[in-house]
């Protein structure tokens, strides 16, 4: 590989590394604080952990030349159900006027109940979107956009847009405790990465996922069920969304509302694209997805510490996404 090919393949990452080096130099001058500290690194990994679940789910759909615009609303749905079930005492809001109180159930059982409910709900909605793609050949941009609107409208109407009370603080201490200064929520993300990597690379389903994404017609001729693979990808995505939403609620220990998670769909898609998962289908690695999530989480965290306006942060993210997609398109055109 010559230097021009190396820059063509890794140019974006080199630029991002240079940006982070510049931020590490500028931050102590402007804010009189170091950016590259163990505390900040752990905070970035902690914030990224739930988002890794979401990005892993979306990545499987992008492998099939699809996407998912409902991820953010799935998070909002998960946060609302989590704060309903895991709240300590009578909640501040109701669902269709009914007030819930689950404190009669032990805290560990409440947390596990919420995880099951959350996974069922997110998997159910994801499966519906998958069915429209697999059976009716509807582009997932449309089916997941419909999902996004339905979920947000349903949750907002059912709860009247009220924010629910914070979860029982004892629950995060049970499931994502700190060991010294180390947040164990990171271990949940590590396990998810290992499991999804195994599914993608060591199972028949994973091999079929790449085959269908690369050429669905050829995959069908070779005996692969395109319907089953498509549904499997959406079901896996739904499960990951459920776990990610549950972890985010435990991480925040805060109130939940239908509006929570707004924009997270774009973050997940952007992380996949920057990580090298191609919209042309059949191309992508788990390591790239994780790298993409860490890049965007670290960038947002660093710019926030530096005091950069949130709106300007969107501009930075947009430029990176545009550059990543442009490089991906150029690679596709060159291959053709």
Regions found by a protein language model. Name each.
Residues 110-117, 125-128, 181-256:
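Helix-loop-helix "hairpin" substructures at the membrane interface of multi-pass membrane proteins
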Residues 1-55, 90-113:
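Membrane-interfacial amphipathic/re-entrant helices at transmembrane-helix boundaries
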Residues 2-7, 62-67, 86, 106, ...:
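Short loop segments and helix-boundary regions at transmembrane helix junctions
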Residues 63-128:
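Membrane-embedded helix boundary and interhelical linker motif in transport proteins
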Residues 1-26, 221-228, 251, 301-336:
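Cytosolic-side transmembrane-helix boundaries in multi-pass membrane proteins
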Residues 241, 252, 256-317:
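Transmembrane alpha-helical segments in multi-pass inner-membrane proteins
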Residues 4, 99-105, 112, 136, ...:
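Transmembrane helix-bundle core of multi-pass membrane transporters
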Residues 23-25, 38-90, 131-138, 276-286, ...:
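Single transmembrane alpha-helix segments in multi-pass membrane proteins
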